[in-house]
């Protein structure tokens, strides 16, 4: 039987590691799957690629921090963006996609 992926726990782990570059392999290792197995499960269970899922997690948390009054520079750093402008561009892109 397939072991279920605890998506909320994976999201919490990812949030604690945003300061370092995360890739599909990092996420897959955390849930004891190969990168290709994880990619397949992510698309099936979350409806998006692992990197899309990770970006959505980062942006959701960034919006929470911004709404709480955190500055753009601090939010960008904590959410793992290279610069404040990279974060604002990502937020703008996401708003256009929804």
Predicted regions and their residues:
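A short, Lys/Arg-enriched amphipathic alpha-helix from helix-turn-helix/homeodomain DNA-binding modules
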Residues: 1-22, 28-31, 52-70
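Short, charged low-complexity intrinsically disordered segments located at boundaries
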Residues: 8-12, 16, 41-45, 70-72, ...
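Basic/polar phosphate-binding segments, predominantly the helix-turn-helix DNA-binding elements
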Residues: 21-54, 76-98
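Hydrophobic positions on the alpha-helical face of helix-turn-helix-like DNA-binding modules
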Residues: 62, 75-76
